[in-house]
Structures are given as structure tokens and as C-alpha cells.
Amino acid sequence: MFVTFRTILGYRKARKYRRDYVGYLFQDYALIPDQTVYENINLAARPNKILSTKAMLTQIAQALDQVGLAGYERRQVCELSGGEQQRVAIARLLVRPPKVVLADEPTGVLDHDNSLRVIAHLRDLADGGASVVVATHSDLVAGSADQHIKVA
């Protein structure tokens, strides 16, 4: 695998790279429904042992604020709408900003307004230097991309 101007050989190195530098955004959100918003985001943040618990709480609160879900930390994921769940998934990306984002139909089940929010967050990640790769059937999502690759 060749990433960021270096070759990554071997299962362990590739796995570590994916863990540390790749973020995923799925159509079905990939959240744990019977846990809180905080617990779901903290799972992604956990590999960062450098931050104290207080600093991590602050970082999670900031990420939730960025996606319009300030104060949702204690809410159960199963109680949230689809748009809110997708924004939790984006907040999960924001606490450990990835170098690469792989998004599979990230707006597939969302209404227009929530789709626009998700697109804006993906655009912000791209503008911040991340490589964002999106698989989509949505013209709205495709229209916000810098480059297109059609697969038939």
C-alpha cells in the first residue's frame, strides 16, 4: 500500500495506518445503538492515550458542537434520528482527524438538509487536508466533489 509518499508493507503496519490515519463514514452509521453518544465517540478517540480524560471530554464536546449536537453526550444513540446519528459518526471522525476518509453512501438515507450538513463536513475535512473518497449515487454529493470517477 502506498500512502502519503511512503510505502506501507505488511499486515501490522497497514492495520496500524488504518487505525491511526483512516476514518470511515458509513450509510448505516456504524454506531453502537445501546450506548451513549459520548461512549460511541470515545471508542474512536481511545487510541489517543496522550489526552487526559478531561481533555478528551472537551474534545468530544467541541466535535459535537461542530456538528450541531452540543449537549447530546448522554443521549442514547438509538433515540436519535438518522441525521443525528450520521452527525455523531462525523463527530467521531473529528476527534481524531483522519488523513484519509472513506465514505460509503454517507447521505444515502438522509433528508436533503442533513445531506447538506454531511457534505459540508466532508468538504471541511477535505479543505483541511484530508483525502476524502466517497462512494455515492447522489448527484448532490457528486456535485461537491473535486474529482469524479465513474464505475459502471
Walk through the language-model features, giving the residues of each.
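ABC ATPase NBD coupling module
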Residues: 2-23
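Short coil-to-helix segment of the ABC ATPase nucleotide-binding domain corresponding to the Q-loop/switch region
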Residues: 35-44
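Conserved ABC ATPase signature
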Residues: 76-80, 84-86
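Hydrophobic anchor residue at the start of the ABC signature
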Residues: 90
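A short, proline-enriched helix->beta-strand linker immediately N-terminal to the Walker B motif
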Residues: 95-99
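Catalytic Walker B motif of ABC-type/P-loop ATPase nucleotide-binding domains
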Residues: 101-104
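Helix N-cap at the start of a conserved alpha-helix in ABC-type nucleotide-binding domains
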Residues: 112-114
